[in-house]
A protein has these predicted regions:
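Short, acidic/polar N-cap/turn motifs at the starts of alpha helices
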Residues: 1, 12-14, 23, 87-91, ...
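Short secondary-structure boundary/hinge segments and terminal tails
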Residues: 5, 70-72, 109, 123
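Glycine-rich loop(s) and the adjacent beta-strand/alpha-helix scaffold that form part
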Residues: 30-76
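Internal, well-ordered alpha-helical segments in soluble enzyme and binding-protein domains
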Residues: 45-52, 78, 86-88, 100, ...
Length: 195
């Protein structure tokens, strides 16, 4: 590959690139370096360029995680029962972030495209507050009123999980998350379930 050998002078930049069998010098007024992060060393993104730039007098912000999953302290039941289960067609909201997509519940927490998209604001909140509390709409194509009306129907002898599946189509990991985060006394209240 190509590696930077030297850089910098007060009248612009002189950069030397060394490639197999040749060397090239480039004079530039400005240089944009696309060097990758520090999380995939086996693919070349090892972050070693940070120290090189600092030694050359360039101010470099610390590398921070991005496009990453997050740890969640699940109950043993959720961790064992729903590890690897996808949450599809959900809307994740956090501050000004609001996006529909999908992600996966893992034993350690959450990961997947929707989580990666929200990773920067979630990371910043965790750095500032020690935690991030997000909102998840598991039925984004249904109105609050429709959900309340359907969930208010008598469930008879059916379990609450069966009632949720029959009336509004919630099942599996989505019901597992409701059990995980809703107080038991509110789990049978249609208005709270629809919120």
């Amino acid at each position: 590959g190509v590696g930077v050998i030297t850089a910098g002078d007060s009248g612009g930049s002189i950069i030397k690139f060394e490639a197999p069998g040749s060397e090239k010098t480039v004079h530039a007024d400005a240089v944009i370096l696309a060097l990758g992060g520090g999380s995939w060393a086996r693919l070349g993104s090892d972050g070693v360029w940070v120290n090189w730039l600092k030694q050359a007098g360039v101010k470099v912000e610390a590398l921070k995680p991005s496009n990453c999953g997050f740890d969640v302290t699940w109950s043993p039941h959720l961790r064992e029962r729903f590890d690897g289960q996808p949450l599809k067609s959900v809307v994740l909201s956090f501050g000004s972030f609001h996006q529909q997509g999908e992600f996966i519940v893992t034993k350690e927490g959450v990961e997947g495209s929707l989580i990666y998209a929200a990773s920067a604001p979630l990371r910043d909140a965790i750095e500032a507050n020690g935690k991030a509390v997000l909102e998840l709409d598991m039925t984004p194509d249904r109105s609050h009123e429709w959900l309340v009306e359907r969930l208010s129907k008598p469930r008879g002898s059916r379990s609450m999980s069966s009632h949720l599946e029959k009336t509004v189509g919630l099942k599996g990991v989505k019901v597992g998350l409701l059990h995980e985060f809703m107080p038991k006394e509110e789990f049978s209240k249609a208005e709270r379930l629809a919120a």
